[in-house]
């Protein structure tokens, strides 16, 4: 058998890692917005014997793995520390041999407290061999600056030190999830009625009621066509008969259309599709990477179900919030659309102002857009000027919030999604190519 050719190397090698820090005093609690003396923290470094250098824990993404999942996995493999991610840092790019470029995405990382739900939700990993990582060290930022080999790594360290001094190292995280894909509504009775009442269907039924229909219903033996009695000529339809038949058909079509319009007005609350269920399970890794500990969702089925695997496996709960559902009825029936959107924005603003654990909001439709709009209202600088993100099913918008004397500021926005592939979508794309 002829040997298979080696795969062509990718031009871009994607990697991910984290600058993990902790207080030198284990009893000290991180407070958002509090300035930190760099002498009061330690950073986690790794030594690679192959390159004889000290650097930050990082590594390549595996097949089908998201960047954030790769970052926490690589840190645990190389250091044994289970961490959660905070704000993103500057992406590092440098050339490799063979015309390749390596792109390394970094986040601020913090060790997970013992018993945290994120620890239970992580897949088990094997420690990196000593030929890859032979030493790890917690050290002061001052000493780390002397130990680091690459200039880019030292720039990342300087960024961490500046954030600590300015009270920007400790941030809060708010995630906005677009629920997973839902089932597609099937053709309703109104649609079937519309099809059966079409002019073509009506004319077909009229044509079937001729002489052959009467002979079939006679109950006796079939009569050869040549011996059949001559049919009486049908009188030509009068203009009044034609107008009456047309009016009946028009009434049937109008009635069917009215049923479809009425059905469209009814609130649709589809459950997750088979693909949406897979997305919900794959969200566990993404939410765990950011250490999500609280979850809010609208009462809509997809919003709830998208967080069910994460809550069930991690021992958490999902708080249902009626105000996040713009189709709410009953006591809310008298409230206008703008007032409902205002309540959604107020709920999002409250979450932004809290000094709370990482939180996810699972919201659909216009309510989700209102939440994102409120988050962007708290953004500053380049973040405020960036184009509003459009989320796909199963994607999350991650807002990293700094808390200063003037209130919360969204310092970074990033989008992440599950890497689940939909076979049906790929099949449709393939058929179009061929």
Predicted stretch roles:
Residues 207-216:
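Acidic, glycine-centered low-complexity repeats within long intrinsically disordered regions
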Residues 2-56, 175, 179:
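N-terminal strand-loop-strand
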Residues 288-322, 347, 402-434:
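Conserved histidine-centered catalytic loops in small-molecule metabolism enzymes
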